[in-house]
Amino acid sequence: MFAFLWKISLCLLVLGVITGDPQAVAAEEKQAKDASPTPQLGVWQFASPSLPPELRKLHGIVEAEQVNRHLLRRRKRSILFPSGVKICPDESVEQAIANHLKYFRLRVCQETVWEVFKTFWDRLPEREEYHTWMSLCEEGTMSIFEMGMNFSQSEEHRSLIVKKLSYTKEAMAGSCTDWSCGGTPTPASDADATTLRDAAANVPPPHEVSIESPPGGTSHEIEDADTTINNEIKKEDEIPVRPVTEQMIEFSIVIAGEKYSEELSDPDTAKYQLLSEQFVSQIQNVFEGLPGYKNIHVLEFSSPEEDSGVEVHYAVTFDGEAISNATWDLINLHSNKVEDNSFMGIEDNPTVVYTISDFQDYIAEILQKNALLENTSLTLDPNSLQLINVKEILHPTQEDPSWITEHPTVLEHVEFDDNTFSAERPSADESTVSNTLPFDFTKPDSTLDSEESDDNEIRPRPESLDSEVSLIPEAPLSSEADVTSLPDGLXLADWNQTPALVTAPVIEHDSLDSLEWLSAPDSSDEFEDTGLSDDFLLPSSPSSHLVPEEPPSTDDYTAPLLSAPTVASSSVIETDTKRTVTAEKEVVTQGSPADSSSADSLLHEXVEESPFPLEVHPVEGEXDIYLGDRMIFDDGSGSAFDGSGKGMEPSIWPWDVATLEPVFYPGPDSWLDDDNDSLPFRTEDIPEGLILDYILNSGNKLDDDPSKDENEGVASIKENFLDESEIFVFPETTTQQVPLLQTGEPSSVETSTQMETLSMDDDSFVKPSFVLEPPEDYSFADLPTGEDLFLPHSTGVSVEDTLLTSTVTLGXEDSLLTSTVAFSVEQPEESSVGQEIISEAXEHQNEDRPTVEELFTAGQSNVGEAATVGYLDKSSLETVLTAEPFEVSTDTSTEEQQSLDSSLADRDTGLAIRKPADVWPTDRVLEKTLDQTVQSAVPTAAQVSTAVPSLIHQATALEGFAGQDGTEHDTHVSMSISTILNSYVTITADTVELPSHLPPMTTTVSSSVVTLAKVGDETTRVLDVSVDLDHVSMVSFSPEPSEEAKSMTDSHMELTTHAHSTEMAGVAWPTHEIHNSTPVPSRALVVFFSLRVTNMMFSEDLFNKNSPEYKALEQRFLELLVPYLQSNLTGFQNLEILNFRNGSIVVNSRMKFAKPVPRNVTNAVYMILEDFCNTAYHTMNLAIDKYSLDVESGEQADPCKFQACNEFSECLVNRWSGEAECVCNPGYLSIDGLPCNSICDLQPNFCLNDGKCDISPGQGAICRCRVGENWWYRGEHCEEYVSEPLVVGIAIASVAGFLLVASAVIFFLARTLRDQYTKSDTEDSQGQGDSLSSIENAVKYNPMYESDTTGYSHYYRRYPQLTSYSSTSAETSTDYSSEEIRHIYENSELTKEEIQDRIRIIELYAKDRQFAEFVRQHQMKLL
């Protein structure tokens, strides 16, 4: 009890303390609250001189304002102005004005704080820093300029300036002629000015780069950066941090006053040269004012789509470091026309000096000024100016030449990170790094002398020259035909994508650069004039091989290499696989015998990627290749970017050297002896002939056994190649209509390519049935058209008046056979190529067209092979093929061969498809599809032909043939198709008549070229195919075969070699776009993009598109983005904000264009939006995450990706409009644009009477109603109450009702039936009464006592019904009745019954006419 009282007293005491001094408690709470938001100074603030001492006096003011903020409570929904100011409805006008002023001060202070940190300290403020400086600015304690002064005097700002100045000096390494150094800075112009920050912000920090060199070489190290603080950017005599770069920008513009003609497609014509000079002299004035300008070159003239004027495709070369990298990052991947940018003032976008539109506006403005001043000879259309592409060329530092090696030493690009590409694996056709064998690119002051060619020499090591084939370090260029060079300023971007070709381009004599021909001396003198050797091999990769003339004395050969522009050597994979094949006389080894374990790896479409720096250590006994003075880096894609902001192109193709070695052997005996049902024709139909196969001999090691004789060596090669590899040959053609016989004996090859993945092995090729299996039909293999079949950068070469002549000298055992095959592609005005094709080829050489013959031979005592392939330099790149038909005709002649060298010397047939004098890299692929004409042929012998696509551009690289343990052959054929005439022209060949002692042979035709084109379609596809002979030996593919093509699968037709050309389609490939689109569809008009704003909070109101918050934010982004996009994108029409999503704020938008846009518009939009992110951060306090940018073209994008659909909704795309919308799943609703939510949550009273709401998948919301012992609720919403007694009563009532209804129905039916019976009985009784009364009436009215007329009339009146039953007339009935009645009364002896019977008969007589007729006949018979 005492304890209980003590507790009560204690509670009273505590209550009294609380109620007695509430003010003190409130004061303490208030003090605690006010103390919490006081700004705290960090350590950095006291250490920095930029902090003012006035901060200590602000506590009172800040506390009061914080208290007021905490006490304010908004009761009603505020009014949101478009500017962002929110006004409460109960505020007065003065308060609203004060709120605007307060909001203005807040925005100005925000901008000031962001800008001062970004400008002086180049970083974002921390949270405490931001709040501190914001409070200073809002209270007016410190002005904007005072804040800038404090920041400019801080130590952090000074160290930042020192660091960036040191970077700038090392990066520039030049004079200050193009920069404003010292003195008072002047305002920069829109076109050619930049700031120090722009120039230095993109310069990476210096790196120390070590260059791996073989023994005897030298290595250079980059000196450390000079950290001296100096405002001068002066020339430093030091090695630059990174190689000097050049920018090559390609433009196109239309000359309005000119008319396009065919002469402008030939660079050698006078009109082409005159127009080029006029154009260069006029356009040169535009670019001379730009910093770093070097020269201008005209690439080509073409006819625009509008057929008005002449479109000029030209390239401008700049010094890459003269203009900031940020400028070229914006321009690089953007191709747009000039737009009016007058509304984009510098005050709205102060940080963007070089934008795409500014650069183009500058050029267009000068063109317009020149046109107004009438200082022009050509009328250029500034509105047609279009930027095509940007290439960057790097110049590595000079080094001493190294030796040939299988693994090249690569200069490290200082801006590459080792881990840049570690997160990505290349696809089957992509590599990530592009480094090409060096060539001394054309410079304005370059000359064609030996000093310049020293850098390109490739010298073998002296110790490796242990074979009889001697090599010279340098071959003299004795004639014009020796020179193979590139045009001025040519970057090898195109050659990176084209594999090693069987031929090299030949440029005019006035080209400034050259490539040396390294060859071995030959015993014959015929080759000395040209500087070429029969041991010459095609240039490609470090490992190359040749076949010696005589048996070697040792096991090793060292083959000479030629630096050719067709080499694209990327990261070389070193494998541990030993590949040896026993062969004689055609065996090539590389390095010493001790190093035979290391071999080349055959790269098939994909390259195993090596991240930078690519340091490959030389192997003892091998030769090293030194990469000369340049490395090429294409603009690329993906997430890998180097320091200059340029991604590296994933389109580099490593190729191996391949030589075509004709080998002759008789056909297998099984063809002649066994049953030949598998062949298209019987053996008796096959004339005698030889099988001509080009063995693909590539970078592989073959064991040489000198003990075997020559015949055994040839036999071993023949046996191995026939037994374990598929035969790959090129088709030979003739002008005569002699059938081309296909070999039906397939052979297999077992591949051993060392690769991570080989997608082409699984799905890229399907072997035709007639190669792997012996049916007689020739089916078209369906090929997938994925990204692994696309060539990212291809060059197209048109063909006009070209001649391809191939001389093949064949020899077998004791008899020598020479077969000269000439391919010609002619214009219609020329005569058809007939039997004089070889002489015509010689005439082409005698003209003023420089020609180079590239010879590759493999000679032996009895077996010699030779092939001559050359190039003309007459056509220009991407020249459109004429629409007239051309012919592909051949001529085959046979003669006795006296010697291999004399045969080749007598035949000057080396003309091939022409290469232009000025060839420039381009992203455009030109294709010409040819209509197929099928002509039925009735040959004298059995005929069969295979549609073989015609190649009109040199774009083939053969990766040769390797063996492992003498049994396995690995044959790869890689082909890069730049310009393909998809003409299924049948190549027919004569079967050569041979002496009778030679066995009959057939010609094996194998096509490794796959073309894919749509005839008549505006869009075409170019495939880059690496053909694995384990999967395919012959492929002739058409995506949509015509009727002729389909019929070829069933019957062997012969296609004529006369094809008609159709319209050529040009495809501009993107440089940052992954080629995952199989076709090139019609270009879309819609581009989707999304971006994330990180400094804005998301609210639920932003889901509702009708809410003021949504409309205000939508209007704000439209005002920001639309002018920016209009100024930088051609044809921009409108921008639509699709929605806002949570995640800070994710803005999903869709822009539309007024006309089709280039395929790489997504890259341009990405770069523009990235620049917008930077601008918005600087000027509008919008922190946009650049890494969240997502841009997709409407034709490839998934519209659902940009819809804010949650897990309770499904995105559906309208089939017709392509619009996507979120449709809620059954049981879910979207209210006011909010994400779909459950009906159970949105409608709490969905289920009544305590029912439970549940979502059934696929059915929607259902209610689970309550159930009791003898009651329950039912209905869709549990609205009906049901009890057990009620159910029983309802059941009883239902049964009773049913019985009642049934009884009623039965009663009604019985009543009805009874009535019917009663009625029928009544009718019968009435009928009998009528008959009796009629007799009485007849007796009563006896006509005997009346006159006839009276009697008749009475009788007739008393029986009127008789007339209704009689079918005769009334008179006839009356007569019969009167006669009968008279007869009855005259014979009175009849009884009463008889009289009644007679009366009935009379009635029947009167009623039924048939009965009356029967009675008459009966009476007549009785009479």
Curated annotation (Swiss-Prot):
Membrane topology per record: Single-pass type I membrane protein
Region described as Hyaluronan-binding motif involved in chondroitin sulfate C-binding: spans on this chain: 1266-1274, 1322-1327
GO cellular component, one term: interphotoreceptor matrix
Segments of skewed composition (Basic and acidic residues): 577-587
Region (Hyaluronan-binding motif involved in chondroitin sulfate A-binding), start-end ranges: 265-273
Protein name: Interphotoreceptor matrix proteoglycan 2
Source taxon at top rank: Eukaryota
SEA domain span: 245-358, 1083-1196
Compartments where located: Photoreceptor outer segment membrane; Photoreceptor inner segment membrane; Secreted, Extracellular space, Extracellular matrix, Interphotoreceptor matrix
Family annotation (Pfam families): SEA
Cysteine pairings via disulfide bonds: 1200-1211, 1205-1222, 1240-1253, 1247-1263, 1265-1278
Keywords: Cell projection, Disulfide bond, EGF-like domain, Extracellular matrix, Glycoprotein, Heparin-binding, Membrane, Repeat, Secreted, Signal, Transmembrane, Transmembrane helix
Signal sequence interval, chain numbering: 1-27
Gene symbol of the encoding locus: IMPG2
Residue ranges of every copy of the EGF-like domain listed in the record: 1196-1234, 1237-1279
